[in-house]
Amino acid sequence: MEIGDRVQTLNTFVPITGEIVDMYKNLVTIADDDAETVDQLLSFPADDLEVIS
């Protein structure tokens, strides 16, 4: 996983998708594709995400 990759959450009822905008150790911050607010950033442990094409 690298900044700019598209990812989605694993093991969730409705997958959350977005683009990686920041990474720090095991914490990955993405810009949520379906955010309904101005602040579209969400953070997840890297193990909870998978890269998609």
Regions found by a protein language model. Name each.
Residues 6, 17, 41-43:
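Well-ordered beta-strand positions in beta-sheet-rich domains
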Residues 11-13, 34:
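A generic beta-sheet turn/junction motif
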